Amino acid sequence: MKLITILFLCSRLLPSLTQESSQEIDCNDQDVFKAVDAALTKYNSENKSGNQFVLYRITEVARMDNPDTFYSLKYQIKEGDCPFQSNKTWQDCDYKDSAQAATGQCTATVAKRGNMKFSVAIQTCLITPAEGPVVTAQYECLGCVHPISTKSPDLEPVLRYAIQYFNNNTSHSHLFDLKEVKRAQKQVVSGWNYEVNYSIAQTNCSKEEFSFLTPDCKSLSSGDTGECTDKAHVDVKLRISSFSQKCDLYPGEDFLPPMVCVGCPKPIPVDSPDLEEALNHSIAKLNAEHDGTFYFKIDTVKKATVQVVGGLKYSIVFIARETTCSKGSNEELTKSCEINIHGQILHCDANVYVVPWEEKVYPTVNCQPLGQTSLMKRPPGFSPFRSVQVMKTEGSTTVSLPHSAMSPVQDEERDSGKEQGPTHGHGWDHGKQIKLHGLGLGHKHKHDQGHGHHRSHGLGHGHQKQHGLGHGHKHGHGHGKHKNKGKNNGKHYDWRTPYLASSYEDSTTSSAQTQEKTEETTLSSLAQPGVAITFPDFQDSDLIATVMPNTLPPHTESDDDWIPDIQTEPNSLAFKLISDFPETTSPKCPSRPWKPVNGVNPTVEMKESHDFDLVDALL
């Protein structure tokens, strides 16, 4: 148990330990604003005419620790009302009128030196004037070291030179190739200084056979690896004038050159033209040996190998299917023979030995029939994921629904002997069909008075087992429990106990005594006695109409007695599970606008709203 706990905690900590050095942070961070302030101040100081630009908002930011802290920024600016010659800073300026103001977007890399000093390494701004084409302004700090992308095209000549330098100045038996560039920095001097950190991997090309890397040289997964840190200076003529390299090699697994196996089977593509002759001989052999009346045809080739053994030996696995061409009317199998979708299917293993110089072919084929699956017929519209229980009763077949949380097991009724009491009940129904549990149907009289045999509660007459849904004799004497919220001359019981013991036990039953014509009711779709419901005539509507009661019974406390009470603490694991996905957080970028534009609140975006019109909803 302790080991499982440790592994679980480690799996949660590993993602945090393997995070990259570059990470996104909040655009409203104080240090981010200071970095943007340094970048925008630097841009304004480079311009000698026109107005200063004012920050609108920061759109993207990422921090890199390598080992100094660098901020990669993207922010939007708007032209202000302060001239460049004024002694004001951009923070003291307001936005110029939008119709006449220029806008722009800048991308910058800013280094943080110490705790408070920010210096701009590189910056590019795209300015869109109120009238005229877009103007691009670039700035690169002379002498400032700043990180660059590991996929920068400027690194390609440096890396190419570095790999060649390593292969020429090491005593390793094989050539190495670039594996991954991990980190790169650039500095503008009288030329450019580069510092690159990358990994290398051993290839399959030995120095005895190859003097330099070629496209045939591939990195070995089990070969030696290394990690290098290089420093290079590229002059203004784009030549590498100085270079230094430091590499650490790590031995891999024992490298063994692949052995060439003469005579071993080699896999070949299943659609290779070399298989055509072998397949033709295989299917001809199959049709000659099979005693069926129809020809077989190759449907699918699963796999194939070829082996050089005094010739060529083909081993083929394929699926053959019976065609519509009979052997009696066709001398041989032709391409026009179509596959019989209801015919026999064979799984075949063929070995074809071809001796080209003798022009002889020796095929052998072994086939096994594949089993055929027959589908069972279901009632129309009936899903295989639904189950219906069919119960035999006297003279009829009843379809019952699966039990739900509101229906007890049917055996409760049969096992309950308390419902055999000698209590007589009288029911009164003044020409109305009241939708209560246990309303029975019988001979309709003016006042509908009578007695009946009951095993459920309610006003019903006849032999009934549930809700009084059935036809029977209106006049009769029987024993059973009665419940009537109106007039009841029988004994009064608590309504909870008989309801739970008898409600929802059987789906529907039909009396086997009398079939008399009754008034038209909503229950005319009930199953008639002596008529069995067969599956071809069975419909979903029949199932629903037969078993759904008119009204649902009231919910009781005892209905949920089968659900156990689980005691949990509010702060327990049952309430606070560890999610497999990161929690969603509010977006960190873009930042809030620096100040309002034309009187608009910078923290609230105003949207035009219209009153709701009913016509819009109807369109």
From Swiss-Prot:
S-S pairs: 27-589, 82-93, 106-125, 141-144, 205-217, 228-247, 261-264, 325-337, 348-367
Molecular functions per Gene Ontology: cysteine-type endopeptidase inhibitor activity
Residues the UniProt record annotates as site (Cleavage): 376-377, 386-387, 496-497
Region Disordered, annotated ranges: 394-495
Pyrrolidone carboxylic acid modified-residue sites: 19
Record-linked SUPFAM superfamilies: Cystatin/monellin
Tissue and organ expression note: Plasma.
Annotated signal peptide: 1-18
A single cellular component GO annotation: extracellular region
Cystatin kininogen-type domain location: 27-131, 150-253, 270-373
Record's keyword annotation contains Disulfide bond: yes
Keyword Secreted belongs to the record: yes
PROSITE patterns with a match to the protein in the record: CYSTATIN, CYSTATIN_KININOGEN
The protein's role, per its UniProt record: (1) Kininogens are inhibitors of thiol proteases; (2) HMW-kininogen plays an important role in blood coagulation by helping to position optimally prekallikrein and factor XI next to factor XII; (3) HMW-kininogen inhibits the thrombin- and plasmin-induced aggregation of thrombocytes; (4) the active peptide bradykinin that is released from HMW-kininogen shows a variety of physiological effects: (4A) influence in smooth muscle contraction, (4B) induction of hypotension, (4C) natriuresis and diuresis, (4D) decrease in blood glucose level, (4E) it is a mediator of inflammation and causes (4E1) increase in vascular permeability, (4E2) stimulation of nociceptors (4E3) release of other mediators of inflammation (e.g.
Protein name listed in UniProt: Kininogen-2
